[in-house]
Amino acid sequence: MRYAVICMLLLAASGCTAARQAPSPEPGLVPPPVVTTPEEKAENPGSLFSDENADLLYADYRARRVGDIVLINIVENSKAENKASTSTNKESTGEYGVSSFFDRSKVGIIPGQTLLSGRTGDVPLLKFSSVSDFSGDGETTRENTVTATIAARVTRVLPGGLMQVEGSRETRVNEETQIVTVSGLVRTSDVADDNSVMSTQMADARISYYGKGVISDKQRVGWFTRLMDNLWPF
């Protein structure tokens, strides 16, 4: 019976804990977009010259159309530091008294009986003293480095020379899967001669690097430990 009561108390306490925000789902692999190329009718069917291969000798192979491939060089280095210090001190004292009450040196309700011994001018009716001190320090440091190269597809061409690109790469080694996804906006002028662009030149960039497998499972906290963290009040 005692164990049943303890279990009921634990369940009731777990219901009172604040609900944690559900983690955002991990981004999956981006499916390839459907690209339809309209058929162009030749103006002169009997001619040996074709506009489709007119620029093969001097063509620019940098990505600029929907469905083209562009290399994204992911080089992300970020470091943030924050430090705060607070110190406060407050001290106050005070005394309140009555020197005379209707020309009497003693204060009392019944004649001959006093509430205070001695003269009221010598003994204060109220005396207080207060001291408050506070000191707090906080410091945080975070550093992140991601380096990778991934091929992305142009999924949309926007006005102003912008291209929306999306790409993903999945690598599986010994039952451990590493997934890299990238998406964002790239200017056609930022694409280098080798058809590559730096991730630092992307706008609205979203880069994810995560894994699935035995190693990732070992790095997670167990469900019972997370439950006790929610129930433990201290």
Curated annotation (Swiss-Prot):
Give the PROSITE patterns listed for this entry. Answer: PROKAR_LIPOPROTEIN
UniProt lists the family membership as follows: Belongs to the FlgH family.
Top-level taxon:
Bacteria
Question: Topology with regard to the membrane?
Answer: Lipid-anchor
Q: Where does lipidation (N-palmitoyl cysteine) occur on this chain?
A: C16
GO MF annotation, one: cytoskeletal motor activity
Please give an example of a GO cellular component term from this record: cell outer membrane
- What is its biological role? Assembles around the rod to form the L-ring and probably protects the motor/basal body from shearing forces during rotation.
Q: Can you name this protein?
A: Flagellar L-ring protein
Residues in a coiled coil are none
One GO biological-process annotation of the entry reads:
bacterial-type flagellum-dependent cell motility
What residue stretch is flagged as signal peptide? 1-15
Subcellular location per UniProt equals: Cell outer membrane; Bacterial flagellum basal body
Xref: InterPro entries: Flag_Lring
Q: How does it assemble?
A: The basal body constitutes a major portion of the flagellar organelle and consists of four rings (L,P,S, and M) mounted on a central rod.
Q: Where is the lipid attached (S-diacylglycerol cysteine)?
A: C16
